[in-house]
């Protein structure tokens, strides 16, 4: 935030790159964010399974990295606890991003700033008997890409196949 305050005093353009660790493991959000998501109120994913049925047939068995995130069989409590931690760390990260957006507003730079938000992957957190990212289900591979800034239409959604032309237009 100090950088934004300093950059706001200059007429020169600036670039700021932030790489949040969240929500990667270990997912350790402050308690106030964890408490926002009581375990007992979290629904299990509709595709929840206690076991990932293909771990042995794909030749991984106990070597499946997912096994380290929560042992099989996956209890309802273990899945809910993982979801709670995932939601909490994302909410905490969102609060930090909010501070940056507030600082851009307060310094008068918001309307002249491009913001690009993306992620490298999602997590299964209980879907299909999995917890991690090493799979090709939508929850793991459909990462967000949000662009905001001068000349970028608001509330416009693009399909994945149009991503390249979207990026070359801006």
Go through each PLM region and give its residues.
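Active-site-proximal cap/lid insertion segments
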Residues: 1-166
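Feature captures the catalytic ectodomains and active-site-proximal regions of enzymes
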Residues: 168-170
């Amino acid at each position: 935030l100090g950088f934004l305050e300093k950059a706001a005093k200059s007429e020169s353009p600036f670039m700021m790159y932030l790489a949040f660790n969240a929500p990667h493991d270990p997912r350790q959000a402050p308690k106030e964010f964890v408490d926002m998501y009581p375990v007992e109120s979290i629904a299990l994913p509709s595709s929840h399974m206690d076991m990932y049925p293909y771990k042995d047939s794909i030749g991984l068995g106990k070597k499946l990295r997912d096994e380290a995130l929560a042992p099989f069989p996956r209890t309802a409590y273990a899945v809910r606890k993982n979801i709670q931690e995932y939601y909490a760390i994302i909410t905490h990260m969102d609060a930090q991003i909010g501070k940056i957006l507030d600082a851009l507003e307060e310094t008068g730079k918001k309307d002249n700033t491009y913001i690009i938000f993306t992620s490298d992957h999602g997590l299964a957190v209980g879907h299909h008997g999995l917890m991690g990212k090493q799979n090709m289900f939508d929850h793991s591979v459909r990462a967000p890409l949000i662009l905001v800034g001068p000349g970028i239409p608001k509330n416009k959604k693009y399909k994945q196949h149009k991503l390249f032309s979207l990026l070359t237009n801006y």
